[in-house]
Amino acid sequence: DPTGDQISAFYCITMLMSLINVDFAVWAPYGDRIAKRLKLLGRTIGADGLLEPLELFGPPNVKAWRLCWNVFATACRMLKLVDAETLVMYAEMIEQYANDFGQACWALIYQVEARTRLEHTVRVKRRGADEKELAIRNGQVHSFDPASPWQWVFDELVGRGESDWWRKELEYKCFMVKTKVRELGEYIEG
C-alpha cells in the first residue's frame, strides 16, 4: 500500500496538476524506508562516438518495476482513477514486453513506460476530450468522461487506441536492438 505521503502527493499530482505519473525511482513499496534510489544501467553514445555507461534511475528490472507499479495501481484504485482490471492489463502488457525482449531491452522498456505515464497520457487525455467535444457537436456519444478521464486513457493504452504508440516507441526499437541493427544507447536518453 502507498504511504500517507505517497497518496497525498499522488492526490495533488492527479487532482491539482491533472497528471497521472509518479517517478518509480522514488515511488516504491515501503516508500518511507527508501534510503537510496533504485538504479538502472544503460549505455549511450559519447561525443567521441563510443558507447559509455549511462546511469538512469528507476527499477532495474521488470520484477522491481512491478512492485512499484503495484503501489501506483493501489493509489489509482484508492482515488478511483482507474479500475483494477485495466491496471492489471497494463502491468501484464509491460511484463510481456519485458519477457519478449529480455533484460537487454529493459532500460528502453522502462524509459518508454515512464514517458507514457509522464507525457503520453496527457496527449491521450487531450485526444479524448477533443473527440468527446466533436462527438457532442455532431450529436453523437463518446465514452471519454472529463470528470474521470484516466479510466478512458488507460483503456486506450491497453487497447487498440494506442497500439501505434507502443509499436513505434517500444516494439520497433526493441526489435532493432535485439537484431543488433541498433545499439540500445541510440534510443536511451538521460
Could you say what each language-model-derived stretch is?
Residues D1-E189:
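Short, low-complexity/basic segments of RNA/nucleic acid-handling proteins
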